[in-house]
From Swiss-Prot:
Subcellular location: Cell membrane
Disordered: annotated segments: 437-471
Protein's name according to its UniProt entry: Receptor protein kinase TMK1
Extracellular side: 24-482
InterPro entries with a match to the protein in the record: Auxin_Ser/Thr_Kinase (IPR052422), Kinase-like_dom_sf (IPR011009), Leu-rich_rpt (IPR001611), Leu-rich_rpt_typical-subtyp (IPR003591), LRR_dom_sf (IPR032675), LRR_N_plant-typ (IPR013210), Prot_kinase_dom (IPR000719), Protein_kinase_ATP_BS (IPR017441)
Function: Transmembrane kinase receptor. Phosphorylates only serine and threonine residues. Involved in auxin signal transduction and cell expansion and proliferation regulation. Forms with ABP1 a cell surface auxin perception complex that activates ROP signaling pathways. Required for auxin promotion of pavement cell interdigitation. Auxin promotes the formation of the ABP1-TMK1 protein complex. Promotes auxin-triggered phosphorylation status modulation of RAF-like kinases (e.g. RAF20 and RAF24).
Signal peptide: 1-23
Annotated family: Belongs to the protein kinase superfamily. Ser/Thr protein kinase family.
Cofactor(s) this protein requires: Mn(2+)
């Protein structure tokens, strides 16, 4: 009887488990059929069998439970079924590089899921509970999706086994979560969040993290990067194109660091020796910051991108700084190297235009840093500048004590440290030194008394004991009366002072504008250097009848000696009479015309000081729909864009109905002139090395536009006539952002000016949909033109060859037989050159893929072209050739005040996987660095 009962119990349990297993497998069947319906794959896809476990790219267990869905790179469209969350045994969901749209369904509860790959699709939203209950999750890749703005959810905390989190170009907003540190994710090694909308500072909770690859570039992140010095596992750090500031940290603990990209930030101070001595370092990019001190010297094995002129080094080549510069930098170090000082304190002579510095016969006599929002302490290094007569540090946020070393200055007359947060005893200065410490409540008190719980009142008296209590009681009523009387008098005095200030301000404005230009004046706004309301610091070296200024002159108080005065001019907008502008263009003479286009005519001009400019006279129809304020707002955005491969917009001119843009002058004209009209113009044909370099220049400029953290631009009309060359035969992209100035609505001429047939991406021409991939397509056409020497549309050719892109792809399919005939006959084809041309041709084919998602980003193009420019060098270089390019040369700095430089991001890559191609041609262009996830695209890391 007992045996029978046991047998029945066993049989019941077995049948129950069998039925549950059957129910689970039926649930998987239902979920997979829903997935098939929502994706609607073609019949050739291999999903026709009624059993999903027999479908291609699907892996199941022996009990028919689905564990893997691996359908990446399949060209699938449609949406994802919410029934996916029922696949409770699913371990890998790989859907990358498709065209799937709609929301990402909730995956909460998929406790077995280890890998989630959704990159490079068109998903538009992601639920907040997407990671809820995913306790086995190890890798997340959701890059390059047009999600609605979202923040990394708290539910990610459940995935404590996470090793890789990649969400580049995924519209992530908010701040970087503090829970991404080692306490929650001890195994996290890849953290990629490039090109999103993250703000705030790096959380200190990242300290101790073993992350090896950190991509946070292209955001709005601020603050310092001190936390990096405690992330000792780092191998790759890309923080470029943010708003980081402060000095670089100590890198001595980062023994495995190989690649460091910090370009396009506001870092200050010297490059630390700990970075220079790293044995593991291979690539470093520090261009376009405010780094100071001597030019750093890295090991010969390190690929360095460090444009000397885009930082604030004392010299243009390695060498010791002037002793005066060394002392001033040590002083700045106590203030944590303020950006405002770093922007001004450039070069090796502090007596030439350094903000707050005045000299006599080459000796520093005055340091005036009042109202500079300084923090930190007063450096003892002030005492090393023996010629100092005045030190003005008032109205800042300085702490600490006044250094004893200042008393040793033999020529010191004035020390003003008023309105700070200093404490401690004031050192004994000579009797003839005027010391102003007003506005420091704790001056005269030592630090121990300030930190004591029973510290004295601000007056300094302890008042302890019985007598003290009695004194306080006796003083109470008189003090109360004094407070009332003082308040009344103080109020009356305040009203009087305010009235006086308003009167002075009014009189000053009358005086300031009484001699200004009439309504005919043209305002040329200088390049933006910071806040919209911030004036530009200029130094007046002379005067001119053609250039006036609105200025205030400030003289340091307390002296009548001329040599002791510091004069600084606050200049707002430069005023240039319209007669001057007309004069330099011969009244907009046709002889001065450089070219014309959809936006208007461009004239050449030369200012009185020899500076050449290009004046674009906008067509009335282009901007008729724009109000003054709107036009000014649009231009204000454009003037913030600074890059060495973008034509500098110096300012805008307004005079009645006329609206003019003032650009830097590019003497060698358009790329079109050198590529298609060289023979008629009497020019030399472009060498292949020149074409490569020009292509790289354009790619870098457009990459910068696409990656702007504060305002993303799409050019929409990229073509050779919008690419201008300087005397050094380096390229700059012109007319970027001008489509924004065109009026909107059906009457807009945007369709005429926002693109040129032959360069238009198919989706833009058909639907008007604009993404950065529109520019990528145009760039691919330009690459084809550089290779063939033919125009994008050439009606002189046979009908089947008129359209360059179609003809080029047909020719390239048969590389050996026909493609060599398609190459420009002026290019000298040796073996190395031909290999280089083939690589660029492959890149051009990718860029001109029909579907936008199949095209790479501009960062990918930069990677490919920069490797060719660096590694492929023709053996026969003619030093007498005026068109020869020294790849190491600096670009000319005709307009330094408004230009900044972008550097290379030659971060190492090697071939691993291939982009899909419409013509099924075998490709050899590397699409991701070795060892990185399959969903990698180079935009993620630039």
């Amino acid at each position: 009887m007992k045996k029978r009962r046991t047998f029945l119990l066993f049989s019941f349990t077995f049948l129950l488990l069998l039925s549950l297993s059957k129910a689970d497998s039926d649930g998987d069947l239902s979920a997979m059929l829903s997935l098939k319906k929502s994706l609607n794959p073609p019949s050739s896809f291999g999903w026709s069998d009624p059993d999903p476990c027999k479908w291609t790219h699907i892996v199941c267990t022996g009990t028919k439970r689905v564990t893997r869905i691996q359908i990446g790179h399949s060209g699938l469209q449609g949406t994802l079924s919410p029934d996916l969350r029922n696949l409770s045994e699913l371990e890998r969901l790989e859907l990358q590089w498709n065209n799937i749209s709609g929301p990402v369904p909730s995956l909460s509860g998929l406790a077995s899921l280890q890998v989630l790959m959704l990159s490079n699709n068109n998903f538009d939203s992601i639920p907040s509970d997407v990671f809820q209950g995913l306790t086995s999750l190890q890798s997340v890749e959701i890059d390059n999706n047009p999600f609605k703005s979202w923040e990394i959810p708290e539910s990610l905390r459940n995935a404590s086994a996470l090793q890789n989190f990649s969400a580049n170009s995924a519209n992530v907003s908010g701040s970087l979560p503090g829970f991404l540190g080692p306490d929650e994710f001890p195994g996290l090694s890849i953290l990629h969040l490039a090109f999103n909308n993250l703000e705030g500072e790096l959380p200190m909770s990242l300290a101790g993290s073993q992350v090896q690859s950190l991509w946070l570039n292209g955001q709005k992140l601020t603050g310092d990067i001190t936390v990096l010095q405690n992330m000792t596992g780092l191998k790759e750090v890309w923080l470029h194109s943010n708003k980081f500031s402060g000095p670089l940290p100590d890198f001595s603990g980062l023994k495995e660091l190989e690649s460091l990209s910090l370009r396009d930030n506001s870092f200050t101070g010297p490059v630390p020796a700990s970075l220079l001595s790293l044995e593991s370092l291979k690539v470093v990019n520090l261009t376009n910051n405010h780094l100071q001190g001597p030019v750093p010297v890295f090991k010969s094995s390190v690929s360095v991108d460090l444009d000397k002129d885009s930082n604030s080094f004392c010299l243009s080549s390695p060498g010791e700084c002037d002793p005066r510069v060394k002392s001033l930098l040590l002083i700045a170090s106590s203030f944590d190297y303020p950006p405002r000082l770093a922007e001004s304190w450039k070069g090796n002579d502090p007596c030439t235009n350094w903000i707050g510095i005045a000299c006599s016969n080459g000796n520093i006599t005055v340091i005036s840093l009042e109202k500079m929002e300084l923090t930190g302490t007063i450096s003892p290094e002030f005492g090393a500048i023996k010629s100092l007569q005045r030190i003005i540090l008032g109205i800042n946020n300085l702490t600490g004590m006044i250094p004893q070393e200042l008393t040793t200055l033999p020529n010191l007359k004035t020390l003003d440290v008023s309105s700070n947060k200093l404490f401690g005893k004031v050192p004994g200065f000579r009797s003839n030194v005027v010391v102003n410490t007003n506005g420091n409540p704790d001056i005269g008190k030592d630090k121990s008394s300030l930190s004591s719980p029973g510290s004295s009142s601000p007056s300094g008296g302890s008042g302890s004991g019985i007598n003290g209590d009695k004194d306080r009681r006796g003083m109470k009523s008189s003090t109360f009366i004094g407070i009332i009387v003082g308040s009344v008098l103080g109020g009356l005095l305040s009203i009087f002072l305010i009235g006086l200030l308003v009167f002075c301000w009014y009189k000053k404005r009358q005086k300031r504008f009484s001699g200004s230009e009439s309504s005919n004046a043209v305002v040329v706004h200088p390049r933006h250097s910071g806040s919209d309301n911030e004036s530009v610091k200029i130094t007046v070296a002379g005067s001119s009848v053609s250039v006036g200024g609105i200025s205030d002159t400030y003289t340091l108080p307390g002296t009548s000696e001329v040599g002791d005065n510091i004069q600084m001019v606050e200049a707002g907008n430069m005023l240039i009479s319209i007669q001057v502008l007309r004069s330099v263009t011969n009244n907009f003479s046709s002889d001065n015309i450089l070219g014309s286009g959809g936006f208007g005519v461009v004239y050449k001009g030369e200012l009185h000081d020899g500076t050449k400019i290009a004046v674009k006279r906008m067509e009335n129809g282009v901007i008729a729909g724009k109000g003054f304020a709107e036009f000014k707002s649009e231009i204000a955005v454009l003037t913030k864009v600074r890059h060495r491969h973008l034509v500098t917009l110096l300012g805008y001119c307004l005079d009645g109905n006329e609206k003019l843009l003032v650009y830097e002058y590019m003497p060698q004209g358009t790329l079109s002139r050198h590529l298609f009209e060289w023979s008629e113009e009497g020019l030399k044909p472009l060498l292949w090395k020149q074409r490569l370099t020009l292509a790289l220049d354009v790619a870098r400029g457009v990459e910068y536009l696409h990656g702007l953290a504060h305002q993303s631009f799409i050019h929409r009309d990229l073509k050779p006539s919008n690419i201008l060359l300087g005397d050094d035969m380096r390229a700059k992209v012109a007319d970027f952002g001008l489509v924004r100035l065109a009026p909107e609505g059906k009457g807009s001429i945007e369709t005429r000016i926002a693109g040129t047939f032959g360069y238009l991406a198919p989706e833009y021409a058909v639907t008007g949909r604009v993404t950065t991939k529109v520019d990528v397509y145009s760039f691919g056409v330009i690459l084809m033109e550089l290779i063939t020497g033919r125009k994008s549309l050439d009606e002189s050719q046979p009908e089947e060859s008129i359209h360059l892109v179609s003809w080029f792809k047909r020719m390239y399919i048969n590389k050996e037989a026909s493609f060599k005939k398609a190459i420009d006959t002026t290019i000298d084809l040796d073996e190395e050159t031909l290999a280089s041309v083939h690589t660029v041709a492959e890149l051009a084919g990718h860029c001109c893929a029909r579907e936008p998602y199949q095209r790479p980003d501009m960062g990918h193009a930069v990677n490919i072209l920069s490797s060719l420019v660096e590694l492929w060098k023709p053996s026969d270089q003619n030093p007498e050739d005026i068109y020869g390019i020294d790849l190491d040369m600096s670009l000319p700095q005709a307009l330094k005040k408004w230009q900044a430089y972008e550097g290379r991001s030659d971060l190492e890559s090697s071939t691993s996987s291939l982009l899909p191609s419409l013509d099924n041609t075998q490709m050899s262009i590397p699409t991701r660095p070795y060892g990185f996830a399959e969903s990698f695209t180079s935009v993620d890391g630039r």
